[in-house]
Amino acid sequence: MLAKRIIPCLDVTGGRVVKGINFEGLRDAGSILEQARFYNGELADELVFLDISASVESRKTTLEEVLKVSGEVFIPLTVGGGINSVDRAREIFMHGADKVSVNTAVVKEPELISRIAEKYGSQAVVVAIDVKKKDDRYMVHTHSGKIPTPLEAVEWAQMVQELGAGEILLTSMDRDGTQEGYDNDILAKVSTSVHIPVIASGGAGNLEHLYDGFTRGKADAALAASIFHFRQYSIRQAKQYLRDRGIPVRL
């Protein structure tokens, strides 16, 4: 079995790392560079940098910030926020990213997934899917969760796989920032409906939640923010906890 990954996420706006609840009520979570340096030395498997206001404000991710972070970390770096063209993806890669995360733009223009994948490889394309439960259906939202779409989560996940995505970052908007655990129902449905890796996101509040995301949710990786940003747990602690319970991790 492949090692499961632990991935801290830097949600960035206004030049700072922030964290909210249900995509709202943002609070400051520190310096971008300080957090990036910390995770680089903390056994994180990868780092995700998401400019969470770029799509909402119809602007591009700040390349200067991406360059600074890429110069500080020596683990795979995924960058997302406002990436709406192959040219923009190229700029992000040129500034040190290993992968790009696309969301709003590819809901509007799904073929963008294929165009980026053809140029840079599927392994470099992460499609972020933000979902909210409504009447027992999990619906995809865009613009940092602000705009609902008619797309259902499993259907969209299968579509992005066919278009060339190499990975899916699945976030439960209902669980985001609540620390109540991942939504393992939709996580398992998506994970078992595709053959590309799925990253669990939204709701991690303790180490058992990470374990549940891997066992009940069938995830390939677990993304978390609050529990690591505010030093509730270290990534080393998380990995040791998982290893002790039979989950393969890199230590």
Curated annotation (Swiss-Prot):
Entries under Gene3D superfamilies matching the protein: Aldolase class I
GO biological-process terms attached to the record: L-histidine biosynthetic process
Pathway as given in its UniProt record: Amino-acid biosynthesis; L-histidine biosynthesis; L-histidine from 5-phospho-alpha-D-ribose 1-diphosphate: step 5/9
Active-site residues (renumbered): D11, D130
Catalytic reactions on record: 5-[(5-phospho-1-deoxy-D-ribulos-1-ylimino)methylamino]-1-(5-phospho-beta-D-ribosyl)imidazole-4-carboxamide + L-glutamine = D-erythro-1-(imidazol-4-yl)glycerol 3-phosphate + 5-amino-1-(5-phospho-beta-D-ribosyl)imidazole-4-carboxamide + L-glutamate + H(+)
Sections of the chain in a coiled coil: none
E.C. code: 4.3.2.10
InterPro entries named in the record: Aldolase_TIM (IPR013785), His_biosynth (IPR006062), HisF (IPR004651), IGPS_HisA/HisF (IPR050064), RibuloseP-bd_barrel (IPR011060)
Function: IGPS catalyzes the conversion of PRFAR and glutamine to IGP, AICAR and glutamate. The HisF subunit catalyzes the cyclization activity that produces IGP and AICAR from PRFAR using the ammonia provided by the HisH subunit.
Protein's name in the database: Imidazole glycerol phosphate synthase subunit HisF
Species annotation: Chlorobium limicola (strain DSM 245 / NBRC 103803 / 6330)
Gene: hisF
